[in-house]
Amino acid sequence: MAQAKKSVDIKNIRNFSIIAHIDHGKSTLADRFIQMCGGLQDREMQAQVLDSMELERERGITIKAASVTLYYTHPNGQEYQLNFIDTPGHVDFSYEVSRSLAACEGALLVVDAAQGVEAQSVANCYTAIEQGLEVLPILNKIDLPQAEPERVIHEIEEIIGIEATNAPTCSAKTGLGVEGVLETLVDVIPAPTGDREAPLQALIIDSWFDNYLGVVSLVRIKDGRIRKGDKMLVKSTGQTHIVTSVGVFNPKHTETGVLEAGEVGFVIAGIKDIFGAPVGDTITLSTTPEVASLPGFKKVKPQVYAGLFPIDASDFEPFREALQKLQINDSALFFEPESSDALGFGFRCGFLGMLHMEIVQERLEREYDLDLISSAPTVVYEAVTKKGDTIYIDSPSKMPDGSVVEDLREPIAECHILVPQEYLGNVMILCIERRGVQKDMKFLGNQVSITFEIPMAEVVMDFFDKLKSCSRGFASLDYNFIRFESSSLVKVDVLINGEKVDALAMICHRNDARHRGIALVDKMKDLIPRQMFDVAIQAAIGAQIIARSTVKAMRKNVLAKCYGGDVSRKKKLLAKQKEGKKRMKQVGSVEIPQEAFLAVLKVER
């Protein structure tokens, strides 16, 4: 639906994003803004309007950044165009945040007035300050009886180091004070700079694939303007496309026919090639190809790798297409084909963390209707061979033989943890159990900020969940990869009836290997259904077996028909049964259920 375009003077535009920790009320505040500026009628309002993915609404988290254009009339009578981007708060999606910030001049830092500052808000806030944005702190959830605005203002100033004495307070749930937030925002956040008469220069912030429209790109116009019918040039591919539709989200898809410097909106040019408009690229018009490219985004490196395999082999091609479509929308996803003896053909995929992996797998299963099995996730290890070559190992099957390896190194993550003083002991114990080395500790009011260096393999598995449970949910975490470090690593193979099952192998530290081997073997014993013969499950490092358990055979009572009778007769029947089981074992194969593959992921420490 096209509508007459309100041409807004560039000095009346405000581009900002909302950054906050998980559950501090970003999406709710966004809902209030939309309601107050009349973006949607009351009947269309629903909680978390911008979290359009079913999965986002279910889990109550924001995964994708979403943009909205609203018109707000300030008490001074001026009408302002607000373009705002709702960003994710979870540590796995921090790259989404840095992309959104590139399109803005300011950021609202939403802090829960009861919980105070958390690690993720600190990390995202620093990203914003580094990119030169104006950061406006806002205290949310002021209606809660346990809200302590003075303490939290003090925390913001002490931990993040930005002025917060005049920070607006509001309650996004009830709508109290939200009007004040909008006023302050217009006064504090600077207007974008840009020349509308200059040649077009626009940055692609995000793109996604629509089966009918092709690639839809979310862009921020730096200079010039783009109209429907223009011939646009994508700088990195050098290809030109005719623009078929231009507009904004308010939050509904609204065509405006033109976007001018300073604005954020969408551009559709019927690009059917999935990689036709990469995120972070620059768009200009085909008549001005000499326009410089804008600095893009740094490529994020996957931290966790896992194999994903379709349960039905005929789904392999649809699975490849689904991954490609997801990859436009989720630039951190990496994949390459892989085959496994146990699971057939599939892809080795790289993710940012365990939550990211779960989300991707669920999106593939829901949006593309696939049934998938995943193998155990591993981080990337570095091996130096005796010849001096460096190899990167992202799967246990690629682990080279011990005889050729000079040195094995594992990735180390620097973890910044913010935790209230009373839980400090528990958190320290957890970090040390995870082979962490303490680097720094600062006391900030009631909170303690500690820095540990912990092997990435320990962090990505379930560290976040454990951290939350040992601190009753108060500790928060932000981590980043710093270096590779030599370590005593081994590959633990799982053998079922003497045959290696490649999808169950794992790489771990030598000190943990025995313990994890025993735990895994015991868990597998419960999950593999009983067969007609004994099934031996073993864990081994090289040729040395470190753990074993047996799934006992089911057997018929062959003596049921001998009432009394001769003992030699009974022995003969039992011997005959034993012989049969032995023959069966030679030819029988064991079906391993999907749960058994998942057991590897959940082996307790």
From Swiss-Prot:
User: Is Signal tagged as a keyword?
Assistant: no
Instruction: Cite a single GO BP annotation.
Output: positive regulation of translation
Q: GO terms for CC?
A: plasma membrane
A GO molecular function assigned to this protein is: GTPase activity
InterPro entries for this protein = EF-4, EFG_III/V, EFG_V-like, EFTu-like_2, G_TR_CS, LepA_C_sf, LepA_CTD, LepA_IV
Name the Enzyme Commission number(s) assigned to this protein. 3.6.5.n1
| Membrane topology qualifier | Peripheral membrane protein
What is catalysed by this protein? GTP + H2O = GDP + phosphate + H(+)
Q: Where does this protein reside within or beyond the cell? A: Cell inner membrane
For this protein, the record's SUPFAM superfamilies field holds: EF-G C-terminal domain-like, P-loop containing nucleoside triphosphate hydrolases
Q: Principal localization?
A: membrane
Show where the tr-type G domain sits: 11-193
Residues that bind GTP, according to the entry?
23-28, 140-143
Keyword entries, A-Z: Cell inner membrane, Cell membrane, GTP-binding, Hydrolase, Membrane, Nucleotide-binding, Protein biosynthesis
- Entry keyword annotation includes Membrane: yes
Disulfide pairs here are none
Q: Which PROSITE patterns match?
A: G_TR_1 (PS00301), G_TR_2 (PS51722)
Q: Which Pfam families match?
A: EFG_C, GTP_EFTU, GTP_EFTU_D2, LepA_C
Q: What does this protein do?
A: Required for accurate and efficient protein synthesis under certain stress conditions. May act as a fidelity factor of the translation reaction, by catalyzing a one-codon backward translocation of tRNAs on improperly translocated ribosomes. Back-translocation proceeds from a post-translocation (POST) complex to a pre-translocation (PRE) complex, thus giving elongation factor G a second chance to translocate the tRNAs correctly. Binds to ribosomes in a GTP-dependent manner.
Q: Matching NCBIfam families, A to Z? A: lepA, small_GTP
Write out the similarity annotation.
Belongs to the TRAFAC class translation factor GTPase superfamily. Classic translation factor GTPase family. LepA subfamily.
Any idea what this protein is called?
Elongation factor 4
Write the lineage as a comma-separated list: Bacteria, Pseudomonadati, Pseudomonadota, Gammaproteobacteria, Moraxellales
